[in-house]
Each structure stands twice: as C-alpha cells, then as structure tokens.
C-alpha cells in the first residue's frame, strides 16, 4: 500500500471484512475498496468474525484500535508505561463510545521480570508475550520452565 494511504486502506479492509463475516449479503463503497452485493461463505466460527488485532502505540493507532480492533498489541519498548498507555486507549474508546473492556491487550516483548509484570497486571494488561531466543529446543524449553517457575507462580 502507498505510504500515505495505507491506514485508510487498513480501515476500509477491516470494515469490509467485518461486513462480509457478519452479513449474508454485503456491499461496500469506500475510497479505496468498492464492491457490490458480495457473499462470503462459510462464515467464521466466531459470530463477529476472527479477532482483529492491531499493534502500535501512536494516537492514530489507538484511535483505529478504539474504532475497529478487538485487541491491541503494544510493544514493551523503553519508556512503555502500561498504566499511561491504557489510559490513552481509554480516552480514544470514550471518544467513540466504546467500552475499553471489549479490547484485549497483549504486550509484545514484555520484560521477563516479575516486578515489571506485576505492574502490567495491576494496570489491567490481559496478557504478555515474553521474549524467547531462536535456540535449540532444549534451551527454549529450559527458558519456558524458568518463566513458569519464576514468573507465573509469582503472578497467580
């Protein structure tokens, strides 16, 4: 997609897909996507279609998430504050009249640090994706066991 129109196209694609997934016959007339009386079958197993997940942390992205997404994938980069970022998402949801609890949050690349993750949990983060190396299976399994012992037990 062209850089300047990529997000407009994304919004239209999500709207068009949701319409096809939820209506027997659907037509769409957008600036970039247009079609008449289209059918989509079989319908997805979930009544509203597969969840739409969008990643990013900018205000533009959070507005798109508030309008169209079922889940948010922020990145746990330096300076990521779960409480502040969730508050920003709540503002965007309030602006479009949508309850924030309809949107799951899965932090990508969260730190494998129990105290940091307790802060994520306290802020209302649904789930985190912890880093794993591209290593031998035995090493990956060792790290997963360590996460289970050091982190999961400390969060429950």
Residues of each region from the PLM?
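Active-site-adjacent structural elements that line small-molecule/cofactor binding pockets in enzymes
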Residues: 1-156
